[in-house]
């Protein structure tokens, strides 16, 4: 199926690219000003931009006929899905950049852009211009923890904690719904994962965690050295009893890592109220930031260990890099990733306030109530929803159409795409995941009606 694009969006991108070409003219010029050849190049690009702007305005009558877009960035296709579609992809929704983050990328996209004013003690979290040092303090206060560091994704937060606390052969408690990166972090540190089984509702409980700790102690003769549990897991986005599990961890004297990959940045998170020793979040999943980005926050009790500085001394040069943090490999996010986090932060703080998160969950439940009206469409995640990410089952509805359709499961993708909806797993009509985070009520209602319209088209029963 050939996807046609909105010409106004296409020309908007072309105008943006032409502006970047103008920017390159200035970058290549002398500090004293443009040469005559550079002035001509500038005027040519300005004329090109005016043409695009006129076309964008003219195409506004009826929004223009959709057409195939062949624009390229070198060999790369231009990504326009966020401008052209309602995107319900399960892991992209809350990583969508704010306008401020996109602007920050324009200004700070160069490699070591954070290092313009790096002075002693030569460490990322000590840089004051731009305000990276202050941002680290803001992160810690926002999460109600004592110290925080930015890291290249939540996985690097898991890795840093495991590296600091886990020795070869140590047991680490994780959920039976844990993300693979939690496994890898433990494995790299030489530890062994021990999974807390989920119950019939696909939930991880405090009692089950306590039982697992006892099982580990009985079989190994030692307590686990770390407990890592997701607040909302990636498979179902079910809410797990992190408060109760944190209490169990405290009772046994085991450090507790709160995995907030699906909460930090969209929902209220108070690390000390939870009882967490570590809070890990994902910038590119939930904080409207460029990948890879994330946050690791901890208490003063554990900061000296997880943020320890190097003691290594060169045997020939006698060099020592004492300010560099071992688990973080020194500096972490040295460019546009970090600046996008900083630029998005005010919006992220606002959107994660309780009333805003509650509204997002209401929209998720509204859509799913309409979705469930199609007989045979079910929600596999806990119901009613407490999150915007949801696992659904359409085996008894849209999959019945797929069984006889010449396009098989791809018919569903075709129908959704034709309605301006994208992000479901193309070809999947049995079990799959979606995320409504960030959609307006208008888009939520449009999305709901689109699913019902497809059901009507194929004579699927609707309650």
Curated annotation (Swiss-Prot):
As cofactor, the record names: pyridoxal 5'-phosphate
Query: GO BP, one example?
Result: translation
Molecular function via GO: Sep-tRNA:Cys-tRNA synthase activity
First-level EC class: transferase
- Note one Pfam family from the annotation: Aminotran_5
Alphabetic keyword roster? Protein biosynthesis, Pyridoxal phosphate, Transferase
Report if keyword Transferase is assigned: yes
Q: Which HAMAP family match?
A: Sep_Cys_tRNA_synth
Subunit structure, interactors included: Homodimer. Interacts with SepRS.
In the record, the note on similarity to other proteins reads:
Belongs to the SepCysS family.
Function summary? Converts O-phospho-L-seryl-tRNA(Cys) (Sep-tRNA(Cys)) to L-cysteinyl-tRNA(Cys) (Cys-tRNA(Cys)).
Q: What is this protein called?
A: O-phospho-L-seryl-tRNA:Cys-tRNA synthase 2
**Biological source species:** Methanocella arvoryzae (strain DSM 22066 / NBRC 105507 / MRE50)
